[in-house]
Amino acid sequence: MSTLLGWLGRLWFGSLGTARPDPSTAVAAAGSTDVTSTQDAWAVLSLVNEWVKHSEAKLGVVLAFVGVMAAGLITIAADIPCPSLVILCIEGAAAVLILASAVLASLGLLPRFKGQSEEAQMNPLFYGDVANHFKGKSEEYVTALSGVIGSQDALIRQIARQVHANADVASRKYLWANRSILVGMLGLVCLFVLAAGVALGW
């Protein structure tokens, strides 16, 4: 039982409580980018972006599954003219769990707009920072981006920061997907119990 509870705890809470070091700090401390090329940094960013896409696809599948469960619940409920108190309770539990699963999946799909408030921490490769710091200042953004691109050290540092941010986004999306799946499975159990109750005349 303790093993099961531990697994459910890890599934629900994930590892968001563990602080991750900023990779741009490690790049700055190294003082040289001879080992890591700019192409390698872009490749790592592309890989992390694929993780984000996969997590969003997973959330989309979960939402579709939740929609099917909601349709099933409506169909079963519509076929019961005079439900008993037991059936009503099961229907209510199933509805709450299905709705909660949909909300959890939707939270995972919400985009992240917040950027760095400090100018020194601004990343010209992140759309949130671009929108916050360069709204209506296209020429200033061109200058800032050119300054980053013109320095391999600065470019790799900014790419590393974006990799770090995107990895955090991906892990959070997977966490919300896991939570939605867990709650959705409980809703599915309620649907099976409801169907059995209707068949047995509860």
Swiss-Prot record:
Role: Pycsar (pyrimidine cyclase system for antiphage resistance) provides immunity against bacteriophage. The pyrimidine cyclase (PycC) synthesizes cyclic nucleotides in response to infection; these serve as specific second messenger signals. The signals activate the adjacent effector, leading to bacterial cell death and abortive phage infection. A clade D Pycsar system. The effector gene of a two-gene Pycsar system. Expression of this and adjacent uridylate cyclase PtPycC (AC A0A4V2JTK3) probably confers resistance to bacteriophage. The genes are probably only expressed in response to bacteriophage infection. Probably only responds to cUMP (produced by its cognate NTP cyclase), acts by impairing membrane integrity.
Localisation: Cell membrane
Pfam families (UniProt xref): PycTM (PF18967)
Transmembrane segments: 60-80, 85-105, 181-201
Protein's name according to its UniProt entry: Pycsar effector protein PtPycTM
UniProt entry tagged with the keyword Protein transport: no
Gene: pycTM
GO molecular function: nucleotide binding
Listed GO biological process terms: defense response to virus
Highest taxon of source: Bacteria
Keywords annotated in UniProt: Antiviral defense, Cell membrane, Membrane, Nucleotide-binding, Transmembrane, Transmembrane helix
GO (cellular component) term, any one: plasma membrane
Membrane-protein topology: Multi-pass membrane protein
InterPro entries the UniProt entry points to: PycTM
Keyword Membrane on entry: yes
